Structures are given as C-alpha cells and as structure tokens.
UniProtKB/Swiss-Prot annotation:
Keyword field contains Zinc: no
GO biological process: bacterial-type flagellum organization; bacterial-type flagellum-dependent swarming motility
Gene that specifies this protein: flgE
NCBIfam families: flgE_epsilon (TIGR02489), FlgEFG_subfam (TIGR03506)
Name of the protein described by the UniProt record: Flagellar hook protein FlgE
Species whose genome carries this gene: Helicobacter mustelae
Length: 454
C-alpha cells in the first residue's frame, strides 16, 4: 500500500483517539472532582529512501537524505489537575479542596488507600463519612471527649497530624432528634450603618390616642397580634432602607393653610416702614412725582424681600393683601405672617402682634416626655397627635377639640404612611386645608433636616 495512505490512516486513527478523549471530557463536565485528559501525539518511524552524502573531492557538495515519515500515533493521555470551580451545594457533608491535594478513601479500613478529588460525601448508618461508592474517608480525628481530663486544654483542641490516619467517624449517638426550640440565646452586634436591605412598615396608628394615660402602650387584637404601637422616630428608616437618623431638635414644618392678612394702605409721601417676621421693610414714595400709588409702592417693597420673609403682597380692590404659602425651607423667619413691629407711614394700619399662624414646627427629642406645647415629638404617636390637633385648630379655631370627634383625622395606615382626612362636619362654611410639608433649616443649627431626608 502507498505510504501516503498508511500515514493518512494513522492520522485518522490517532485523531479518533483524541476525539474519544475530548468526548469523555465533555461527558463528565458535571462529574464532581473530574479532571480532564488530553492526548499526546508522537510521530512514527521514518523510512529512508536515500542516505545522506558527504562532499565529493571533485567539488560536488553533500546531500541530505530522503526520509519519509510513516504517520502518527497517540503516545499517552495525560490528566490535567488544574483547579476547578467550586459551588455551594447546601449539603453540610460536601467538601472541596482548593489547590493541590486529594481526599484519602479506603474500602477496607485503611489496608488499601485510594485518592480522589470528589468531595461528595455522606454519613452511613455507623456514622462513617463515606463516598457514594461506600469508600470511607480517612484522616485525623480530634481526641475523644472522654480523654479531656488526661491531656492539656491546648492539646485537646489540637488535631495531631503525626498520628496514623483513620476512618472519619462521628458516633450516631451524638445526634439529637429534632424538637421545637423553647428558648433562644442570641449574642450579636446590631447594624450601626445608615442603610439596611430589608425594611418593614411602621405599625398603624388610629386617629385617637390608644390609651387615656399616655397614648404609647401597644394594642393587640383578640389573637394577640400587635396592631398598634408607637415607634421612636430616631430609629426609623426610609422606604429605600436609608436611616432617617433624627437627632435632637431636627424636624419639619407643616403648613395647613396659606397665611393671609388684608389691610388698608395710607397715602403718604414720607418714609414708610414695617417689620414682617423680624425683617424690616421700608420705602419712600411721592405718588405725585412718581406716578406710583402708595399701595403699589408698598407691594413692591414687600415683594422685594420675599426670600427673607416668605411673604408676597397683592393689591385687591385698593387694599394690600399679604400671603405666605409656607413652602420655603427655613425657620420661623419665612413661615406664617407676623407683624413684629408697628408699621409707619403707609403701613400705619399694621400693628405689632397682628398675625396669621397656619404653619407649625415639629421638633424631634430623645426625651421620654416631649413637650407637645412647643411641638416636640419622639414617637410616631406623638407626631400623629400633634398634626391632628393643629389641623383641627386651623380648620375651625372656635370648635373645642376632642380627638374622638375631630373633623380632621390623622393616622398611620397599614402601609406606614401618614394619612390625613378632612371630614365634613356639617358646617356650610367651606373649610379646605392646603397641607404642605417642608424641611426645617437654620443657619444657627448644624442639625438641619431637609424634606429629602425623610
């Protein structure tokens, strides 16, 4: 037969062996502890048709021989013991070796020993750690508890690797049958971070105080399920898991209506001044010379300082109407309308003490007895009760407040949200509320709290 055919056949046969090896590797891709193999090729002997010649004396140079190879053969298959990937199996007896090494297993109490990378073990009825094929895993065992008094504490807790290896066995009598837990002792560090991955809604709170004494004691249903409980605002988190982190005197402003005040403006050519929310406003205007009326001049002067007072002025039927929507972040200087000094000139009709208070500041405190009269709160119940009381006060100042019959109810619903309901109390007068919540901030405080925080 032609040599080329022999070489081709040998190549096909050798690559068939290599393909068989790779097929076996693929077939065992999910075999625990399997290490892949590779085929090593070697060329077969060559047939020499012409031998090499040396240079001739007559001047002819030397020539190489003419050799023809006779094909290829598989010399060996080699195991490649590279580190494989590990994965969690949730089986307590499954083990894996990272790096070099083997598990030692034996079918006959150690007379013969085999080695494997397969760590898929389990316990048999006698407590032996065995492979799926029944081979017992061997290694070093810690000293028996009965020997504890004979050796030092350090030696008892040390595994002596100089001793002969033995079967790994755990006495089945050491195992306890499953039973319900009666007491649990826990020692752990609480998460001191400002973010948690899992959050739950705060407990719901009705629109009436839960107890006539303190409004704090929790309420349970007939099945002993906790239904209402006041919670400390300083330990709460937002829906996204970020800590609110309230500290002393941090809090919010809640406006229930737009503050308004209407008054006449006196015509004058001299200087006019007024103090609103402790900000002095003044102007001088001669209507005959400027062509601007005193009421328009007063409007312009007040609007020029709106960023400091929160108050905006309008002219209605020749009268000056002041308005504060209470929607600016800040302290009392930009909330409500308060005349803090007598007006002069065009503002002569504005008297110190005149005010329209429709926004209230609520401040967090760590005190166990918050002063509700100054807007202090500590728990969700404290804040709920404050908002409900003030909302009813703004809606109808003449009505005696009783939380059980309040026409504005405030509660925390089952979703942990503050729910405010303006109920119809039968009064023909339209009593709408325009609620706006803004953050409290002050240049004199480092504990400012913005609406984005909560």
């Amino acid at each position: 037969m032609l040599r080329s055919l022999w070489s081709g056949v040998s190549g096909m046969q050798a690559h068939q062996v290599a393909l068989d090896v790779e097929s076996n590797n693929i077939a065992n891709v999910n075999t625990t502890g399997f290490k892949y193999s590779r085929a090593s090729f070697v060329d077969m002997i060559s047939q020499t048709k012409l031998i090499a010649t040396s240079p001739h004396k007559g001047g002819l140079g030397g020539q190489n021989d003419v050799s023809v190879g006779l094909g290829v053969n598989v010399n060996s298959t080699t195991k490649v013991f590279s580190q494989g990937s590990t994965q969690n199996t949730d089986v307590k007896t499954d083990l894996a070796i990272e790096g070099d090494g083997f598990f030692i297993i034996s079918p006959d109490r150690g007379k013969t020993q085999n080695f494997t990378r397969d760590g898929e073990f389990l316990f048999d009825a006698n407590g032996n750690l065995v492979t799926n094929g029944g081979y017992v895993v061997q290694g070093w065992m810690k000293d028996d508890l009965r020997n504890a008094e004979k050796i030092s504490e350090d030696d008892f807790f040390r595994v002596d690797t100089t001793k002969p290896i033995q079967n790994i066995q755990i006495d089945p009598a050491m195992m306890m049958p499953a039973r319900a837990s009666s007491n649990i002792s826990l020692r752990a560090n609480l998460n001191a971070g400002r973010h948690v991955d899992q959050v739950a809604n705060v407990f719901g709170l009705g629109s009436t105080t839960k107890t006539p004494v303190d409004g704090i004691n929790p309420i349970y249903d007939s099945h002993d399920n906790l239904t209402q409980k006041a919670e400390d605002f300083g330990a709460l988190f937002t829906q996204s898991g970020d800590a609110i982190g309230l500290t002393e005197n941090q809090g919010i402003w809640v406006s229930y209506k737009t503050s308004e005040m209407v008054n006449d403006i006196e015509a004058t050519s001299g200087e006019s001044s007024i103090e609103i929310n402790h900000t002095r406003i003044s102007f001088t205007n001669d209507s005959a010379a400027s062509g601007i009326s005193s009421v328009v001049a007063a409007q312009n002067a007040i609007n020029a300082l709106k960023q400091k007072t929160g108050v905006e002025a309008f002219v209605d039927n020749g009268m000056l109407r002041l308005q504060n929507k209470n929607n600016m972040d800040g302290d009392a200087e930009v909330k409500n309308i308060r005349i803090t000094a007598d007006g002069t000139g065009a503002f002569a009709n504005f008297i110190e003490g005149d005010s329209d208070i429709t926004a209230f500041r609520y401040r967090y405190t760590t005190s166990a007895s918050p002063d509700s009269g100054t807007g202090q709160f500590r728990t969700t119940e404290d804040l709920r009760a404050l908002i409900q009381y003030d909302a009813n006060l703004i809606k109808d100042p003449s009505q005696a407040y009783t939380d059980s019959t309040a026409s504005v109810s405030v509660k925390f619903n089952k979703y942990g949200m503050l729910e405010i309901q303006n109920k119809d109390n039968g009064d023909e007068l339209k009593q709408d509320l325009n609620i706006f919540v803004s953050g409290y901030s002050s240049e004199n405080s480092t504990n400012n709290f913005s609406e984005q925080d909560g």
